[in-house]
Each structure stands twice: as structure tokens, then as C-alpha cells.
Amino acid sequence: MRKYEVMIIIDPTVEERQVDSLMEKYLKVITDEKGTVDNVDVWGKRRLAYDIQKKSEGIYVVVNATCEPATIQELDRLLAIDEKIMRTKVMRPEIH
């Protein structure tokens, strides 16, 4: 199992109270495959550095998880399909 950090930018038209239920739906993929979700940090609505899909704001969510590489690939694939998700970035945090 490896540690991953996933940054997700959600469409700003989604209400912020719906973000938790939206994330729960996707993070279930990790827990179903015997991985763990270590932390979910909702940063809220922030201005983007440049427009994405003609929008200048997005709701940022950072997820720290421990799981297998195939599981994180499936999560990234599912997030890419959803129109509410504007952008994702999967990273392996550096160990110091």
C-alpha cells in the first residue's frame, strides 16, 4: 500500500454542503478495496490561477489516502467522468 495525495477541484456551482456527500461517494472506492482515507481537507471556494472550463473559481478538496496503485487509478478515472469535477491531480507525497 502506498500513500497518495489527491487534489480535486469541483465546479463552483455545486453547493458547498453537497461536497461532503459527493466526496463520500468517490472515497468509498478506496475503502471498498481495503485502503484507508487518512484525511479529507475541504478548502472551500477559491480563485483559480487560470480559467478552467470557462470558470474562474472552484471548490478545492485535498484527500490523503493509503491504497494500492490500481485503486487510485480507478478513483481518478471515476472523478474524470463526473462533470462536477473540473480537475484532479494525484501525487505521491515526498517522505523526508
From Swiss-Prot:
One annotated GO biological process: translation
Source organism superkingdom: Bacteria
Gene3D superfamilies given in the database record: 3.30.70.60
MF terms (GO), sorted A to Z: small ribosomal subunit rRNA binding; structural constituent of ribosome
GO cellular component, one term: ribonucleoprotein complex
UniProt entry keywords in alphabetical sequence: Ribonucleoprotein, Ribosomal protein, RNA-binding, rRNA-binding
HAMAP family per record: Ribosomal_bS6
PANTHER family: MITOCHONDRIAL 28S RIBOSOMAL PROTEIN S6, SMALL RIBOSOMAL SUBUNIT PROTEIN BS6M
Function per UniProt: Binds together with bS18 to 16S ribosomal RNA.
Similarity section: Belongs to the bacterial ribosomal protein bS6 family.
Protein name per the record: Small ribosomal subunit protein bS6
